[in-house]
Amino acid sequence: MPPLFKGLKQMAKPIAYVSRFSAKRPIHIILFSLIISAFAYLSVIQYYFNGWQLDSNSVFETAPNKDSNTLFQECSHYYRDSSLDGWVSITAHEASELPAPHHYYLLNLNFNSPNETDSIPELANTVFEKDNTKYILQEDLSVSKEISSTDGTKWRLRSDRKSLFDVKTLAYSLYDVFSENVTQADPFDVLIMVTAYLMMFYTIFGLFNDMRKTGSNFWLSASTVVNSASSLFLALYVTQCILGKEVSALTLFEGLPFIVVVVGFKHKIKIAQYALEKFERVGLSKRITTDEIVFESVSEEGGRLIQDHLLCIFAFIGCSMYAHQLKTLTNFCILSAFILIFELILTPTFYSAILALRLEMNVIHRSTIIKQTLEEDGVVPSTARIISKAEKKSVSSFLNLSVVVIIMKLSVILLFVFINFYNFGANWVNDAFNSLYFDKERVSLPDFITSNASENFKEQAIVSVTPLLYYKPIKSYQRIEDMVLLLLRNVSVAIRDRFVSKLVLSALVCSAVINVYLLNAARIHTSYTADQLVKTEVTKKSFTAPVQKASTPVLTNKTVISGSKVKSLSSAQSSSSGPSSSSEEDDSRDIESLDKKIRPLEELEALLSSGNTKQLKNKEVAALVIHGKLPLYALEKKLGDTTRAVAVRRKALSILAEAPVLASDRLPYKNYDYDRVFGACCENVIGYMPLPVGVIGPLVIDGTSYHIPMATTEGCLVASAMRGCKAINAGGGATTVLTKDGMTRGPVVRFPTLKRSGACKIWLDSEEGQNAIKKAFNSTSRFARLQHIQTCLAGDLLFMRFRTTTGDAMGMNMISKGVEYSLKQMVEEYGWEDMEVVSVSGNYCTDKKPAAINWIEGRGKSVVAEATIPGDVVRKVLKSDVSALVELNIAKNLVGSAMAGSVGGFNAHAANLVTAVFLALGQDPAQNVESSNCITLMKEVDGDLRISVSMPSIEVGTIGGGTVLEPQGAMLDLLGVRGPHATAPGTNARQLARIVACAVLAGELSLCAALAAGHLVQSHMTHNRKPAEPTKPNNLDATDINRLKDGSVTCIKS
């Protein structure tokens, strides 16, 4: 239902703040809610199942003499004395009250077995037997539940209530009860109830289906049901146990489906959908925590939640007041109102805590995925751990779970329901079993008793004849049942012990505390991110202060000369923001001790050998480097501080390379996260190179708008591509098609003879060889999957080209590991012992080099992008003509490139756009060589321009490499493709390839239009040239000016 008034959203703020509080402390809220709900649950169960008592007796043990008392009531009792002629039937009460000196019990036992070889046991006190029936006469009512025969067969009395596997019998009894009630009810009422239950089950099914569409797993849907069930039990407890309003089980059975259908789960579904979508949209930007996501979700949907529930609550209260003379209806309306009230309470508490927990699990899972991907892509584990702590992604989908896991989850739930059903309903289940296993009709005295009564029963006597008791041989499943029941019985007895119960309670408390601790530990990244953002903002403000206020003295008197202006080093401080590093603190220590000498080299070497390098000053560490005692590459490991290592390396190189520029700040190095660089992006780091980053867009690609970042130092490039975006959008945007996705690696091997090389090629080309190599290759990674191996021979050299999917990573390192292992398996397992691996990379890939194989076969992502530009847009925006553009494209991009013998270069300047986007997004700039392979086609269609770019070898990734750096990662966030995709690995990288192709499309369109109109040189002169500084007026007279003019003419002629 839409909001009825505008201020409704403000009403949701209180419950939104409650949901944020719950999201920050999910374990506490969940435990507290479940404990309260469990108390209400036990109270309600005790109310409805009044035979079940909350005492210390185990639910698996019966009360003393319970079976004997029940059997005595079911016996047929007969009395005789000397004054009576024959036997008189009496009741059980009379049999227990009459003072007869002798009371005998006649047990009627039947041994029934489908196996005729099973022998019937021999029993004492047998007075009569016929076929499979034995009569036992004894003076006490004791029935053996198990009897053994001479051949070892064990017989069991089937009236034992502890039968977990008699489902068929129980089903029959329930069916009989159900049939009897249905036949007595009105057909129209039955139809309504059946319809209501069908709608209720459909609503529950819709809950799971809708949750699955949002990307949720099974447990979030189940938690929604638990939330509603808790509301039901709390409402029942308040209504019946506190208010004393009785709601019968029949009323609850009839009315509950209508409540479920009317209220439904739509609000919880929308809250979960908003939260999960928000989590995916935020991606890896680290600007929002899980409790903030939950807060926004409840704020968005909370208004409608309050509105719908309050309307229903008022309706039920009004109905209860209007129909107060109908007690059953009134009580049910009160119950329904309380159900909705507790729904309003539990949704921002229990359900929000569950949702926050789910988001936290997504974050943890995302961390694991990123760490594994980075390690497989060649990033050192320490750096991978650093990145995975700050950048996390989730992968979870109910449909992607294995069938075994789903079955196990469902089995746990069904087991829980069955245990409750079995324990709490034990009494009436026992009655149902007895009605089937016992013949409860009144049993007459057998002839062998009545005929010999005068001889055997001369005095007063009572004979109680039991119903027919059935014994059956024990089967294998019953032995399993016995083991299960024995285990449960022992556990139940152990838990009742006063020491064990306290131990279990202590273990529960410890478990809850540990879970809280572990969850808080998993959420450290959230608080860490928030603290870092706050520190960054504070640092930015501090760095905006005027530079003239800096009073810190400099280390040297050297100056930085720029043009004709001279400025001291103190004014050349970097203006980049971020927290100060330990190297700056060490610099201050160096400044304070300028008059102190550096310790002797021998003493420094001793400290280095003892592992105390961190205690040295930067100048002392630099001295060790200068004297060759400490390698440049080992500074990060020895100092344990990447930023300090960069500072020391700059000091040392400024002397070793005689490069005083490194002692200045012209190449910045401060306030940069070198932890992400170490072991992943660069070695011997001395700083970072700032590049200007522009943005083009919005550019509509396949119906979605993107702003595309470009890092470049070429003027007009961003402006030109921006004009292309405007023209493409005017035609409805760009359309893309991805035709291939597979990174390649091409090893080269050698065999002793050409025949062996040829045989190996034939084997690799066969289905057997392909499958064998795929199995070996795929075992090396959870992401890389081998698609195909292409081979070729050159003499005895065999070249192989492995084509592999690599998820969202660019994947060169990932493939190299798989190729290396596959070649090893060929030598060791597949019979190619004489194969010699010449190189893991034989340039048959081909990587970072122009090659026709990449142009023909493709490498990485093969994308075709197309757009239709209306004719009037070509004229007004591009300032050109459709026919002129088509003619220019043919002459320049097709004929001109062919005349130059180009391979993959049938375009105007695809490399310009590809390189600029690669630099901005942390891609490998060297792979611009093959990624820029592109053919641009244009044609006129009904007066409009249709332009397309076909790029068969775009090599990109959204995780690993330069994407781990924060600035580049931020630009990937701008596009919404950072890190691995949550549910479909490879989707983000493929989308990035589409974006790159469309950026090239915009650039091609604009440049070709500029060339066709002759605007290229003019635009570069306008944007790339600064206006000349005005010259000072001279004092030349007219005679001198005329002389200079004549001289210039003479010079030109000569």
UniProtKB/Swiss-Prot annotation:
This protein's source sits in the domain of life called: Eukaryota
Bilayer topology: Multi-pass membrane protein
- List locations, semicolon-separated: Endoplasmic reticulum membrane; Nucleus envelope
State which pathway it belongs to: Metabolic intermediate biosynthesis; (R)-mevalonate biosynthesis; (R)-mevalonate from acetyl-CoA: step 3/3
Name of the protein this chain belongs to: 3-hydroxy-3-methylglutaryl-coenzyme A reductase 1
Q: Tell me which PROSITE patterns the record gives.
A: HMG_COA_REDUCTASE_1, HMG_COA_REDUCTASE_2, HMG_COA_REDUCTASE_3, HMG_COA_REDUCTASE_4, SSD
Q: What does this protein do?
A: HMG-CoA reductase; part of the first module of ergosterol biosynthesis pathway constitutes by the early steps of the pathway, conserved across all eukaryotes, and which results in the formation of mevalonate from acetyl-coenzyme A (acetyl-CoA). HMG1 and HMG2 catalyze the reduction of hydroxymethylglutaryl-CoA (HMG-CoA) to mevalonate that is the rate-limiting step within the first mosule. The first module starts with the action of the cytosolic acetyl-CoA acetyltransferase ERG10 that catalyzes the formation of acetoacetyl-CoA.
> Which chemical reaction does it catalyze?
(R)-mevalonate + 2 NADP(+) + CoA = (3S)-3-hydroxy-3-methylglutaryl-CoA + 2 NADPH + 2 H(+)
Phenotype of gene-disrupted mutants: When both HMG1 and HMG2 are deleted, cells are unable to undergo spore germination and vegetative growth.
Show the InterPro entries listed in the entry. HMG-CoA_N_dom, HMG_CoA_Rdtase, HMG_CoA_Rdtase_cat_sf, HMG_CoA_Rdtase_CS, HMG_CoA_Rdtase_eu_arc, HMG_CoA_Rdtase_N, HMG_CoA_Rdtase_NAD(P)-bd_sf, HMG_CoA_Rdtase_sub-bd_dom_sf
Please list the residues that bind CoA.
S720, A721, M722, R723, G724, C725, K726, V877, L878, K879, S1019, H1020
Which GO CC terms are listed, alphabetically? endoplasmic reticulum; endoplasmic reticulum membrane; nuclear envelope; nuclear periphery; peroxisomal membrane
Quote the record's binding site residues for NADP(+): S781, R782, F783, D808, A809, M810, G811, M812, N813, M814, I815, S816, N1024, R1025
Which residue ranges are assigned to the Cytoplasmic compartment in the record's topology? 1-28, 209-217, 268-309, 358-400, 520-1054
Please state every residue range assigned to the domain named SSD.
189-357
Q: In the record, what terms sit under GO molecular function?
A: hydroxymethylglutaryl-CoA reductase (NADPH) activity
Q: Which family does it belong to?
A: Belongs to the HMG-CoA reductase family.
Q: Where is the composition biased (Low complexity)?
A: 567-582
- Return the annotated region ranges for Disordered: 567-591
- What are the TM regions of this chain, as residue ranges? 29-49, 188-208, 218-238, 247-267, 310-330, 337-357, 401-421, 499-519
Q: Which organism is it from?
A: Saccharomyces cerevisiae (strain ATCC 204508 / S288c) (Baker's yeast)
Q: Which GO terms describe its biological process?
A: coenzyme A metabolic process; ergosterol biosynthetic process; isoprenoid biosynthetic process
Q: Which Pfam families match?
A: HMG-CoA_red, HPIH, Sterol-sensing
Top EC class, one word: oxidoreductase
Q: Which residues are glycosylated?
A: N115, N181, N452, N490
Question: Which keywords label this protein?
Answer: Endoplasmic reticulum, Glycoprotein, Lipid biosynthesis, Lipid metabolism, Membrane, NADP, Nucleus, Oxidoreductase, Phosphoprotein, Steroid biosynthesis, Steroid metabolism, Sterol biosynthesis, Sterol metabolism, Transmembrane, Transmembrane helix
